Regions:
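Short, hydrophobic/aromatic-enriched beta-strand segments in well-ordered soluble domains
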Residues: 13, 119-122
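Residues at helix-coil transition
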Residues: 27-28, 81, 157
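Hydrophobic pocket/interface hotspot
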Residues: 22-26, 32, 57-59, 76, ...
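Hydrophobic-ligand binding "helix-grip"
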Residues: 34, 63-117, 154
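A conserved amphipathic terminal alpha-helix motif
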Residues: 123-157
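Hydrophobic ligand-binding cavity/cleft-lining segments
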Residues: 1-48
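Residue-level preference for beta-strand/loop junctions
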Residues: 5-7, 53, 68, 101
């Protein structure tokens, strides 16, 4: 895991499943609610599978300190089947343009014997200071990333 002073968390977990099975969960927005340990991520508004960079998918979310219910629009920034998937969360402005929040999620999958090493990176280094102060970024500690990978492992079974 990275040092807590960095503006990112990086955690790796070996999951006893092939990369394709893990990637199938990550590329399915409807299953994202099963990849986090709480009840923050809700149902996907866009349930089509993720197929490449530039694709946008929306997910319903809930966080008290962010005002309760909201929709997060994610733009896929990396997509290599069975290897890498990443997205940049944000909101849509009045014209429908994606406005990034300044944080991103990335999963890197590496075969390891009969399993897969899954590295999850959460980076908030580009998040505006005003938003950091208002919501408290990061809104969770590094243990949330570890618990997210455990949830992903359960979702893959």
């Amino acid at each position: 895991m990275t040092a807590p002073t960095e503006e990112r968390y990086v955690v790796t977990r070996t999951i006893p499943a092939p990369p394709a099975k893990i990637f199938a969960v990550l590329a399915d927005p409807a299953r994202h609610k099963h990849t986090e340990p709480g009840d923050w991520v809700r149902d996907a508004e866009d349930t089509d599978p993720i197929t490449g960079t530039g694709q946008m998918f929306a997910v319903n979310m809930f966080l008290d300190r962010a005002g309760g219910h909201y929709v997060m629009h994610n733009v896929v920034t990396a997509f290599e089947p069975d290897r890498t998937i990443a997205w940049l969360p944000g909101q849509l402005d009045e014209s429908g343009k994606h406005s990034p929040g300044g944080w991103w999620w990335r999963y890197d999958l590496t075969p390891n014997g009969t399993g897969t090493d899954v590295t999850l990176t959460y980076d908030w280094s580009e998040t505006d200071q005003g938003f950091r102060d208002a919501v408290g970024v990061p809104v969770f500690g590094p243990e949330f990333i570890e618990e997210s990978l455990a949830a992903l492992e359960r979702a893959v079974r």
